[in-house]
Each structure stands twice: as structure tokens, then as C-alpha cells.
Amino acid sequence: MTFFFAANPEEAGARLRVVDAFQRKHPDIKVRTLLSGPDALQHVSIYCAGGKCPDVLMAWEFTYAGLAERGVLLDLNTMLAHEKTFAAELRADSVGSLYETFTFNGGQYAFPEQWSGTFLYFNKKLFAEAGVRPPPGRWDEQWSYAEFLDAAAALTKRDRSGRVSQWGFVDTWAPYYSALMFGMNNGVPWSDPRLNPTHLNFDDAAFIDGIQFYADLNNKYRVAPTASESQSMSQTDLFTSGHAAMALGGHWRYQTLERATDLDFDIAVLPTGPKGHAARSNIGTTGLAIASSSPRKKQAWEFVKFATGPVGQAVIAETGLFVPALRSAVRSPEFAKAHTRIGNIAVLTGGPSHAEGLPVTPQWPKIVALMDRNLGPVLRGSRPAVSLTDGLGPKIDEVLRTP
């Protein structure tokens, strides 16, 4: 049986622990792993177009719908129909919003294996030295965009020449995604509806205001570096080296930060805009799917059940590499033990249930290309965010309406 996934070296090691645990339980099923290249969607498309689709595939929330629409992925409901007990246990232990992320046109095309939403890392030492109160460590506690900006300003330091020696905020995620997160946290979802949307909310004033606030962090308020200002050092390195007080990112950064032995950090919730109602993250997630053309569906099914079920999720919890998708695993002592450097563990354990869904559509690759071109000038400060209402919104909606 072949298993296709994407991973950096640390992630690959943790995934192989799941594979090893599976093979100890199922010695009759041999697993051959296939590590993706830089573009996972293109890589798997080449495999499948050539008639060599892997039996089990890692699936991403943004791109799986296109594969499902083309018939590449098996509807797992066809397997669940014969496993009523497992189906009931999985649904009971799953966070509904994560599970439903992989539901498309009535089919269930993957089971979630992790939550990879975003939050804030912050440098405890820098906050203490500046006399700034640490940000909230629970999703039921809010802090406003104004409070976030005040903290970032207080934590930005300049030398006598005006050169910045310490930034208040850096972003280790994709900037245009982060900008839309700030729009979402101003009280507006990305799309209506979430699954198979026909419209993205670039015509909503509150959504646009959130994007503008994010762009202003570096262009107007100067509390975050521009792209050119961070060319000599990555945003992640700025944080790990103590040259930034806050960093937007996800759990995928934890392994890197944990290795920075001189860094005293914790995590916090994202700020909420004036039109927002509660602190929210995004439903970032990956799952495991089965190729519809697989000649080894039975073996693939056993692996997917294992990896996304209680035993495999417990292995993931012990590694500390992912935030497991099952409640039992994410709330386990083993998961907490793997995160001893984090005090605000509730940001992770409560993240999946305090996350807003991002759009699920087969057209997402085309939308990303449009956003990349149109959001760039806004994030660089050469255009206002309101220009997206007429400049980007109609283009995206046209793509969504075109089969």
C-alpha cells in the first residue's frame, strides 16, 4: 500500500511513527511512503494522471475539492456504511467543523488528522521588559485590534538613527491569508456559504476594514517589517532571535521555536476587530483520503481508520508535532506533556472549536492566483483595501460561478 504525504524532516519522522505503529498492528499490510515535492497538488495530479495514484493521500482543506470533483478521491461514506460502530465513534470524538471540512457535495472525501489553525506566539521576556500585559491565552477572552496595536507599538524599538532593532509583530504565514484572517476577525466570514461558495465577501466594509488594518501594521503604523525590510532575516528568525515580540503562525512553527533554547515564549489568541464578536482562528486542517482507483482499498481503509482514529491520533499527540483532530487526543496528558514550553495550552486544545471555516471549492487554485496578484499592492501600501471591492471581488465571484 502506498501513502503520499508532504512534510519537512521533523514531520516526516512523526508520520513514520504512525506508519510503524500501524504495521505492528497489521504486519500483513506493508506501507510504502511517497514524500511530496514542493507542489503537492501538482505532484499527486501527475501520479494520478499517469495511472499510479497513491492508495492513501494526504488531503488539504483548500485543494481536496478539486480532486473530489474530478473523481480522484473515494467517498469514504461508502466504507463507513459497513462500519457503523467506527462511524459513530469517529463522529462523536471529532470536532464537527473539522470533520465537515472534508464533506463536499454530499460525500466525505477525507478524515481530518490535525488542526493547523493560526494564533499568536509572543516573547514573554520582551513583554515583561516593556511592562506590557501579555495577550489572552484562552479563546473565550478577547483583546481588540486597538489593544493589539498598542502592544505592538510599545514593543517596537528604534535606535537613534530611526532604524528598527525590535519589531512588535511579524507574520510567519502567507500574508494574503493573514490579511483575510484579520477581515474575518472583524466579524465577517470569508465566504457565503462556506462549502461551494458563490461569493467571497470583498464587498463587505467590515471585511475590507480588517484587511486594511493588517496592511497598515507595516505601511502606516510601522510595527511590522515590510517584505524588503525582512529580506536579510526571515520573519520566523526575527522572532526566534528576539528581534520581534509577537509572531502570527500555527502549530507548524512550534518545533522550530522549541529548539530556540534562549527564547521564552508562549501562545495567545488572535485579536478581534471592532465589528467582531469573539476571538477566532481558522479551520486549517489536513486529512487522509483514499484514491478511488486504488486496487488496495481494503488495506488503505485500515490505514486511514488507524491514523485518524484513537490509536493513531494518540501517537500524533505524543509526538507534539500536530494538534490532533480528535478531542480525546488533543485533551490527553500526552499532548500536554509534549508541549511543556507552552503555558496557554488552551489556545491549542480550544482552537478547533473556536475556528471559522475557510472556503471549500474546486476553484480555489484559481482564486489563490487572483488574490496573490490583487492583494499584493494593498499589502505593500500602494493601493487601499477598498480597491479590492471592485478590483478583486467580481473576478473571484465570476470564477466561482464558472463550472
Task: Annotate each predicted stretch with a short phrase.
Residues 77-93, 137-141, 159-161, 165-168, ...:
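Short, solvent-exposed loop/beta-turn-alpha elements that line the ligand-binding surface or hinge
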Residues 46, 54-55, 86-127, 277-280, ...:
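A structural signal for short loop-to-beta-strand junctions that line the ligand-binding cleft
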Residues 20-24, 30, 106, 130, ...:
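Extracytoplasmic/periplasmic substrate-recognition and gating elements
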Residues 268, 318-373, 377, 402:
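Long, aromatic- and glycine/proline-rich binding clefts that accommodate carbohydrate-like moieties
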Residues 150-153, 196-228, 270:
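Glycine-centered hinge/linker elements that transmit conformational signals in sensory
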Residues 103-113, 118, 128, 144-199, ...:
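Extracytoplasmic/periplasmic solute-binding protein
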Residues 1-72, 82-91, 134, 228, ...:
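Conserved N-terminal structural module of periplasmic/extracytoplasmic solute-binding proteins
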Residues 62-119, 182-183, 266-268, 337-339:
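Hinge/lid segment of periplasmic solute-binding proteins
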